[in-house]
């Protein structure tokens, strides 16, 4: 596995902590959870989630939308995802958060 599993765990933990630090206290965000690089950002409703997903995709970030209420942004980057990529993703979510 050439260290990919440990790398995914390390970068995933970093990404979750940065998301919690930057947007975790937002009224639009209900929860941030996951394991490794599989992370879900639960939003207040599906409309807010759809808007955030569309804005992320317009910025070249591929994410999904899921959950029983369709209000979770699903992050599943490749195992080679780096800290720099995580920082870019967090910056984009911060910008989007300000517009929600």
How should each PLM-predicted stretch be described?
Residues 1-100:
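Conserved N-terminal phosphate-binding loop of PLP-dependent enzymes in the Aspartate aminotransferase
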